[in-house]
Amino acid sequence: MKARPLLSALALLALPLGSLPAAGPPAEALAYTCAGCHGTDGSSAGPSSPSIAGLDPEVFMDAMQDYKVDLRNSTIMNRIAKGYTDEQIQGMAMFFARQKLRPRPQQVDPTLVALGAELHDKHCEKCHENGGRPGDAGTLAGQWMPYLEFAMADFMDEERDWPRKMARKFDAAIDEQGDRAIPALIHYYGSQQ
């Protein structure tokens, strides 16, 4: 019977520990749930998903928040984003920002690449610096070309909102080159390693 008071005392001491919130999984573990589409390090292995390695954390967080509240069109990201807290999204954003983008070689048309480089320099470079490499305006360089086609179609079909300046610049590129503008930009970005 003397053991009973000791067990009761130990049980009382353990109560505060049980009431503490459990620490969530680390950001790296959360980020690995993205691997099926975006690659284990954020460099996508498949042509319909964007690479998110090296992405500016604010761009990542803004995109996830937009998915979370259905402001950004997607097949499944809206449902996925709703499963994460703001803190978890921030942790994943920091994880992916530290990763190095590893573009995959793609088949491109050299004539379109050259035209796309000119269009980018004239209309896009100011916001998408260094040829569209990872930065605070998102990553274009080295993205899969089919993904870029889907993203451009979303903008053109008004499934995704254009920033005003981007819409004006894009209209100017289309006025200049017509139907060749979009494929040229896509080939240029897809050509970059």
Regions found by a protein language model. Name each.
Residues M1-P5:
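Positively charged n-region of N-terminal signal peptides that target proteins for export
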Residues G42-N73, N78-K82, A117, G132-D157:
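Gly/Gly-Pro-rich "capping" loops immediately C-terminal to redox-active cysteine motifs
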Residues Y67, F95-F96, H120, F155, ...:
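Conserved hydrophobic/aromatic "anchor" residues
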Residues A23-D41, V108-N130, W144, R180:
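Sequence/structural segment immediately N-terminal to covalent heme-attachment motifs in c-type
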Residues S8-G18:
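Bacterial N-terminal signal peptides
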Residues K82-R104, P146, A151, D171-Q193:
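C-terminal capping alpha-helices of c-type cytochrome domains
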Residues I80-G83, E87-L112, E125-Q143:
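Accessory recognition modules or surfaces
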